Swiss-Prot record:
This is Large envelope protein. Pfam families: vMSA. The gene is S. Residues 79-99 are annotated as: Disordered. The lineage of its organism: Viruses, Riboviria, Pararnavirae, Artverviricota, Revtraviricetes. Residues 109-163 are annotated as: Pre-S2.
Length: 389
């Protein structure tokens, strides 16, 4: 508390004063108001818990002094804002406008695209940006390396931009194909169940198909015939129906693939010889001379005339198997030749044929949609095979 003989003022009764223990004047300065050795109490001038109750402390000047607090009027002054000279310097300052390039980099204005690309061809410059082993464009001559940590990192990692682009494009395509394939697989797996429901509905015309599922050993509750448990007697019939449906789907896919290969001209089918019902027999079964020179697919069939020499006859470039089947069926069923004019007339796209097709679609369209609805997931697969094969 300093070097004087005063004591502290815990109750705040004598603000900015000291009290001599013996209530006698100090020899240095008898006036306690101007005593240079007194202690300063900043808390005495504040409004707080004093000797006369909470929130009231007599100020300097007497019991009830001259201030407003002494008269019982306590006012709270609002906090003053900081001056304008100081409150605008805090926070992020706006970025100044960059000077033009001709002022900051005058040497860059002397460069054009030709000079720039010629400079990049310099091995010393290329070595800085395309280190050996990391460049994706051409062969780079090695340059004397400077002891730089950054250059050593680039020499180990290489050029990251082309590699990342290739990796991204390399993964994105297979990922999309895998996602589309998984989606089609989930849809294809619903085909057997849909066809099984249609098959079993034929036995329950006018009502919901329900399998009683009664077994003498372990009776089960009523359920759908397409979801029989293994303990149900109808479980073996459900498995048999599913197996037949899978064979039917496989046969449908094989027929589509055969038609596609036949349309592309990839089936070396020998046409029937005029006046005969079968192709020639004998050891001469392969083509010795191609009918169209060097070709990727076989384009001729070898026959054996009476003189014993093999002769190659060209086969159609497309629809060879279809034409072979038509010729084979026409030889065995002569009445099929009567359908040729009708097929040609229908293929002529006459207005009558178009009206007939439109009427058939309008009349049988909804029923056909219900029948062909399970096979809709197969259409994208057939379309992709037709386009890419």
């Amino acid at each position: 508390m300093g070097q004087n003989l005063s004591v502290s003022n815990p109750l705040g009764f004598f603000p900015e004063h000291q009290l001599d223990p013996l209530f006698k004047a100090n020899s240095n300065n008898p006036d306690w108001d101007f005593n240079p050795n007194k202690d300063n109490w900043p808390e005495a001038t504040k409004v707080g818990v004093g000797a006369f109750g909470p929130g009231f402390t007599p100020p300097h000047g007497g019991l009830l002094g001259w201030s407003s607090q002494a008269q019982g009027a306590i006012t709270t002054l609002p906090a003053l804002p900081p001056p304008a000279a100081t409150n605008r310097q805090s926070g992020r300052q706006p970025t100044p406008i960059s000077p033009p390039l001709r002022d900051t980099h005058p040497q860059a204005m002397k460069w054009n695209s030709t000079v720039f690309h010629q400079t990049l061809q310099d091995p010393r410059v290329r070595g800085l940006y395309f280190p050996v082993g990391g460049s994706s464009s051409g062969t780079v001559n090695p340059v004397p390396t400077t002891a730089s940590h950054i250059s050593s990192i680039f020499s180990r990692t290489g050029d990251p931009a082309p590699n990342m682009e290739n990796i991204t494009s390399g993964f994105l395509g297979p990922l999309l194909v895998l996602q589309a394939g998984f989606f089609l697989l989930t849809k294809i797996l619903t085909i057997p169940q849909s066809l099984d429901s249609w098959w079993t509905s034929l036995n329950f015309l006018g009502g919901a198909p329900v399998c009683p599922g009664q077994n003498s050993q372990s009776p089960t509750s009523n359920h759908s015939p397409t979801s029989c448990p293994p303990i149900c007697p109808g479980y073996r019939w459900m498995c048999l129906r599913r197996f037949i449906i899978f064979l039917f789907i496989l046969l449908l896919c094989l027929i589509f693939l055969l038609v596609l290969l036949d349309y592309q001209g990839m089936l070396p089918v020998c046409p029937l010889l005029p006046g005969s019902s079968t192709t020639s027999t004998g050891p001469c079964r392969t083509c010795t001379i191609t009918a169209q020179g060097t070709s990727l697919y076989p384009s001729c069939c070898c026959t054996k005339p009476s003189d014993g020499n093999c002769t190659c006859i060209p086969i159609p470039s497309s629809w060879a198997f279809a034409k072979f089947l038509w010729e084979w069926a026409s030889v065995r069923f002569s009445w099929l030749s009567l359908l040729a004019p009708f097929v040609q007339w229908f293929a002529g796209l006459s207005p009558t044929a178009w009206l007939l097709v439109i009427w058939m679609i309008w009349y049988w369209g909804p029923n056909l949609y219900n029948i062909l609805n399970p096979f809709i997931p197969l259409l994208p697969i057939f379309f992709c095979l037709w386009v890419y094969i």
